[in-house]
């Protein structure tokens, strides 16, 4: 967490290797994946959602086409989008459904770390809760770690075990979620 401009998104980009940084990033996982705030801008409007979810496997994996299709369909079902959605395009989906496609696309390559940059802030509260519940279920099922970037302290409290507070590009506080909320050093 941190105010706008504190370096939260820059930290995420550094972990993903999208920006230069000084220092060292250590993680013992397959390539981290990202889920963005606005799923519509990160989904190709010309592709079906099945094709969108298949793309990372086409790029990163060496799988036969039938396995790519099967895995994409399984992942879409896992995030709550059954076969009736697979041939739809992003413009035919609600915001929550598009965010489910983004989550499926991130998880299809089986990362250990998923970075969620304000991933539920554009959704109404009811849909936010559904997506957060889905993320917690997937976290347990796939043994995932999440890096949540959010201004919404309720999201942080509900979903995180540990919290870092950033200010002017620096980590100024790091502790358990309970310690940060009960005894903040940087309120």
Model regions: which residues?
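Conserved ABC ATPase signature
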Residues: 89-93, 97
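A short, proline-enriched helix->beta-strand linker immediately N-terminal to the Walker B motif
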Residues: 108-112
